Amino acid sequence: MSNHDQKRDEGYIEKLVQVNRVAKTVKGGRIFTFTALTVVGDGKGRVGFGRGKSREVPAAIQKAMEAARRNMIQVDLNGTTLQYAMKSAHGASKVYMQPASEGTGIIAGGAMRAVLEVAGVQNVLAKCYGSTNPVNVVHATFKGLKGMQSPESIAAKRGKRVEEII
């Protein structure tokens, strides 16, 4: 598992989460291809992930980066942390994320850390249970972040003031 990151001219932070070699067996032998999993974010709440496949590693990474830029979501952050603690799952991967006080840093492993870093989360406590397959962990993390709402948006939906729901 590689952790490659770079800044692009659009202001996005790009991280390579995983490159995997897969083999297709045919009559004449094996055909090797590569898959790449990447996450892209602006460090201010916009984040996306993508997967790319190709015969060459750089082409797979490029396809994954383009897919990640196309599939970006907006996350409502509470400053540099999450709004509230949450659980999420995808397949056999389960993730738990909770907000942390200023100065805590990102306490998360592997694929979750990459997603949270590019999203702009700087203080969080996170744990992955079950399968640690990076693809499923990234999916589960995204499900949790996508469902997170700010108290202001919840109050607006209910037609109440923020003080009434907190």
Curated annotation (Swiss-Prot):
Keywords: Ribonucleoprotein, Ribosomal protein, RNA-binding, rRNA-binding. InterPro entries: Ribosomal_Su5_D2-typ_SF, Ribosomal_uS5, Ribosomal_uS5_bac-type, Ribosomal_uS5_C, Ribosomal_uS5_N, Ribosomal_uS5_N_CS, Ribsml_uS5_D2-typ_fold_subgr. Residues 12-75 form the S5 DRBM domain. Signal peptide: none annotated. GO terms for cellular component: small ribosomal subunit. The keyword rRNA-binding applies. One of its GO terms (molecular function) is rRNA binding. Pfam families: Ribosomal_S5, Ribosomal_S5_C. With S4 and S12 plays an important role in translational accuracy. Located at the back of the 30S subunit body where it stabilizes the conformation of the head with respect to the body. The N-terminal domain interacts with the head of the 30S subunit; the C-terminal domain interacts with the body and contacts protein S4. The interaction surface between S4 and S5 is involved in control of translational fidelity. This is Small ribosomal subunit protein uS5. It comes from Pseudomonas syringae pv. tomato (strain ATCC BAA-871 / DC3000).
